[in-house]
Amino acid sequence: MSVEKTNQSWGGRFSEPVDAFVARFTASVDFDKRLYRHDIMGSIAHATMLAKVGVLSDAERDAIIDGLQQIQAEIEAGSFDWRVDLEDVHMNIEARLTDRIGVTGKKLHTGRSRNDQVATDIRLWLRDEIDTILAEITRLQEGLLGLAEAEADTIMPGFTHLQTAQPVTFGHHLLAWFEMLGRDYERLVDCRKRVNRMPLGSAALAGTTYPIQREITCQLLGFDAVGGNSLDGVSDRDFAIEFCAAASLAMMHLSRFSEELVLWTSAQFQFIDLPDRFCTGSSIMPQKKNPDVPELVRGKSGRVFGALTGLLTLMKGQPLAYNKDNQEDKEPLFDTADTLHDSLRAFADMVPAIRPRREIMREAARRGFSTATDLADYLVRKGLPFRDCHEIVGHAVKYGVDSGKDLAEMSLDELRRFSEQIDADVFDVLTLEGSVNARDHIGGTAPNQVRAAVARGRKLLAQR
């Protein structure tokens, strides 16, 4: 053990000061100081409530609030001296408050524990983060709607198993991402409801003997409700886990989107081009233009998934109530919020700037017998059972593979080898336009349905 010693603010019960290494090892101020604004907000509300119930005088309340506001100004000016020996954001601020206003500063913590204090701080912080993230989701969705509307008639191949399946419009494809992000938005809105419950007043674990009125601090801090059990109030980290789960789903969606953008920008696809400002080059290969933004977002999804797993593992073995283990909740939570926010911001900036290569997309849609299902549906309308039609078209596709011809490139006589039900009108359904226009229903790829979906999407966003 190291011989350097340091004193803590709770040292009254101890016969020797804590070891200096242990002090550094157990301190959290290096990362939890980002909670300072919310810590001060909670303390101001707590002091206001204590004055209302007569625990503090009005003069003491005013001195505390003024001191806290001055401390916030110091922190934001970069002149605050963060001390590791004071462990965390809470004790750093309280110690500085006492330096500023004297013994009155020591009264702030009356009826409160760091256990309910930190739980309150995290909820206040996460509530703000969710609001910021929701705004970025909306901004990305707006970009998708604009691009989808512009590309409502642009035809590209749709894929299953990464093999050409059926023609779709680029606008329709983009709207799939709009839908996924909409679910992400809803999950985070729902998560926010459970974040916005106030633990302050739970004290260490059993509540407090002081005549506090939790409804006052609840209203001052903008919480929806007061937590109903003090043990749960200081122990609960469900809200953080739930946020990381919702964030993981959102990052999974962005990762899938990223994978498509990486594929589409490759020389093998060439479906889209990204502006140079969203790409980087190679230190050795002069020709390279690398889609680093989507690649990095794809990679960053893993750290968010890891944070979720880490928080679940952190909580699974803890008895009630608070344990020091919970200090480990903040870094994965902070990192998850930062990563999701930055990834959404990058995509919200980048997506409206995507430049589709329409002719290349269209040519790709012509290949791979993408209208085979349309031919089968055509034969169904002629009165044949679908399974028979499926087999007939399968034979036609095999012939096309052997002869190097797409279905639309075959002559009527060639097509009639497989079914005498085929007439000259078949070529209307074998065109790319005929294929996408035929899927004219809600959720379909027809251009007019894409435009209708864009209109519905804009109405949805306007109601947020």
From Swiss-Prot:
It is found in: Cytoplasm. Its EC number is 4.3.2.1. Pathway: Amino-acid biosynthesis; L-arginine biosynthesis; L-arginine from L-ornithine and carbamoyl phosphate: step 3/3. GO terms for molecular function: argininosuccinate lyase activity. One of its GO terms (biological process) is arginine biosynthetic process via ornithine. Pfam families: ASL_C2, Lyase_1. Keywords: Amino-acid biosynthesis, Arginine biosynthesis, Cytoplasm, Lyase. Signal peptide: none annotated. Its main location: cytoplasm. It catalyses: 2-(N(omega)-L-arginino)succinate = fumarate + L-arginine. It comes from the Bacteria. SUPFAM superfamilies: L-aspartase-like. GO terms for cellular component: cytosol. InterPro entries: Arg_succ_lyase_C (IPR029419), Argininosuccinate_lyase (IPR009049), Fumarase/histidase_N (IPR024083), Fumarate_lyase_CS (IPR020557), Fumarate_lyase_fam (IPR000362), Fumarate_lyase_N (IPR022761), L-Aspartase-like (IPR008948). Belongs to the lyase 1 family. Argininosuccinate lyase subfamily. This is Argininosuccinate lyase. It comes from Pseudomonas aeruginosa (strain LESB58).
